[in-house]
Amino acid sequence: MVFTRAEAVADGVSDSELKSLLKRGDHVRLVRGVYADAAELAGWEEDQHRTRVMGVARISNLLVSHISAAVLHGLPVPGGDLTEVHATRLGVGGNRHRSTRHVHSGIVSPEWQTTLEGVYVTTVARTLVDVAKTQPRLAAVTAADAALHRDLCTYEEITDALHSAYRHRGAPRARAALRLADGRAESPGETWTRLALTHPSLPPCELQIEVYDEHGRFVGRADGGYLEHGVLWEYDGQDKYHRLLAPGQTTLDAVLAEKRRESGFTELGWLVVRVDSSDFRVPETLRRRMLDAIARSSRPGWLPPTGSWAVMPRHLSMQRTSLTA
């Protein structure tokens, strides 16, 4: 719970009692005059940042923006810098840094402003542009993938937000990152894998491939692959089996179903490459594994998989809109 000193006093907590709570470690000070339960800062980094953002928003007439807005919108930002709370003071002065806050200045038109849990915050599309201007590519693309996958914004809205920030510092960087966004990614791990495999040494991969047997029966859907080479790839994250759980299923049920699905792929002649978080440390090793798998198709006697396949189409708006503004 985030609360102000005035709210604590109104509830009968004296300044000396508040100091005792801080000294014992039950509560922490977020900014001057704003406090939170210490337990709320003991979770994941994004949760800690969210609590700090809510604290700053309680006493400041600011528009929460950039990576802090992404956290409020519930977007993943792996590799992003969460050491400071980011907000924008509209049209006043220059950027200001404090130990825990980065206050930007600039013009954010009303169409790119919204409220979330009573806090003024940039819209999802504008947030994605600001993140892409200021954070690593992985954080920017992962946030954009998640926003598109959850239908929190559209490709057109991102394009419009890019146009509105056309002259901003970092705009070319933002355009380059957001051109890579793809709402078919179902997890940050899938985004990372796709970016790692987007490399001159590898051909472009397809995403969300539905595989069918010779009789047209659905076998399963793979995260990605190289269709001409008979290669599929699957990202195995910690949350994968939770996402696969059907009502009434246990984790064991999901694991067994996953094994049957992979067996179905291999019986049709597909080669399945598994990817997990250990690959994050050395992406070059993953690319070599994928190249080795692809090379199989050039060997004498290789036969393509039987059955059929279909690629889940990219969002319809992407077919009409180019993120090259």
Where are these regions (language model features)?
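Surface segments flanking catalytic/ligand-binding clefts of nucleic-acid enzymes
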Residues: 14, 148-325
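Short gly/ser-rich loop at a beta-strand->alpha-helix junction or flexible surface loop bordering the NTP-binding
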Residues: 1-172, 206, 295-325
